[in-house]
């Protein structure tokens, strides 16, 4: 239960209703609860970490840092007490709750990261993004990080204890803002470490995901759930004239975490029109479906992949040069590994020679931001990918030693430019480049007798195109889409299970086409981009096509490796007007490349499944040719995949030649 709030009044701030809370004068009694042994152990551990931190650090909490527009961002600063000189800064900026006090538990939060940084001679600065917790202003996802990020770095480097060098680190929303700010080339920002950072990548090469909002032009539905909790234009805020002591006291009294009721997303994602999903779960008004007084204007669901609004906020695009050393962490089952790899390669190709040589990447076989949760038997979904552990913390501190302190770092010196995990074989491999050095491509062509439907059909992947066209046909009904089973993703509650699962139970559906290769005669490493080209037809004006790639074991189990989708209206490009389909015509569509790494042992097969939906990982195309997001009814599409000499539908994958694993 939250403490009672007295003298509540309402104020208007930036055109948005906010509640200003006057602080109670006296202490607030915590609710009496019986602690479990686990909670008692946690409290004891955290208290010990806090004591250690206070013994070696100058602790300066709830420092309000003024931005150029006068709004103040809340920061907690930890720096070594007995430093012999000025120190470098590790900067963590986040929309999430870093408050030092766990109000519910009545104890400090886990300060082990801050303690580790101070022990190694760093200042460590936590800062909340604009419009979150104790930070002032109006929140917009990646809306104003360019100016706020630059101003924060300038503030840090101007402090008397600073050596003038700042390095950024963090995962997910704590990473996404970094790239666009790095591209501002702010003096003092010496290096960056981005982890699971796809929502910060706007446009890069063929990818127009605009911060993970799209894939192939289809909406990635993860942000509906995420924004339900995070778009907090109506929230409790404190008066602007409070002292630092007042704010510290308040931070031990008030838990400012948004705690909305958890909706039944299994039902909510089905709501039509799509723009009303937030309303259907009684979510707050905000940037998802409402026009807002923010730099990009809000109303994200109504945009298209090349809408001007995407270029007014804090996304990084490939015309923004990055010329700072970078340490990049990615994972095979994250939301967007391929745009992230494309961003890494783009920086290596466009930075100055010295900086291009200072870009390092690690690609792990884990879910979103789960790097340090790898174990001796790392299980992703139902697939055991073996011992995927790695000393990420050691590498990050070694990286900062090199680029913030200017000292030798043996761990960095021995680190390969690209380190990637090969699933199946379950081993780390390294390469000077991505795709791996020496990689070649192999093509397999789709064929069938016209009955590739289901796991039990006659679809095959063969070495040469040809034969008579017997197109494989299926019905795509938006009211009965293929539901998501595994894959890469994030943040959709219990509605979607991400990772790798045996796909066979789902492949009995008649609206899924299945194509199998012959068993591999020898072990084969497939590491790099996979590109699929299909020749398709439909009686709908617009529809989607999807594919999923699997490793089929000798016992018949088929574990998914990667997947993709393409909205047909964007098949000629996201920066071009939409193009529509005509009944009876066959169209070539090439999906954006999607990356993975897997070792196919002898006797295993490569399987590709084709359909027109993967919901609710991606939104449903209602097949009408309309806006989709504001439509309440769809139509059934009669879709087909063609494969003959004139229509060489194929999958192209990347093979790394080598001997036995």
Which residue stretches match the model-derived regions?
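Short glycine-enriched nucleophile-adjacent loop
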Residues: 175-186
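Short beta-strand/loop motif that positions the catalytic acidic residue
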Residues: 328-330
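Alpha/beta-hydrolase fold nucleophile elbow
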Residues: 160-173
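Accessory cap/linker subdomain of secreted extracellular hydrolases
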Residues: 32-35, 48, 110-111, 119, ...
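C-terminal, loop-rich substrate-recognition/catalytic regions characterized by aromatic stacking residues
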Residues: 32-34, 240-282, 377-661
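Active-site-adjacent alpha-helix of alpha/beta-hydrolase-fold enzymes
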Residues: 338-359
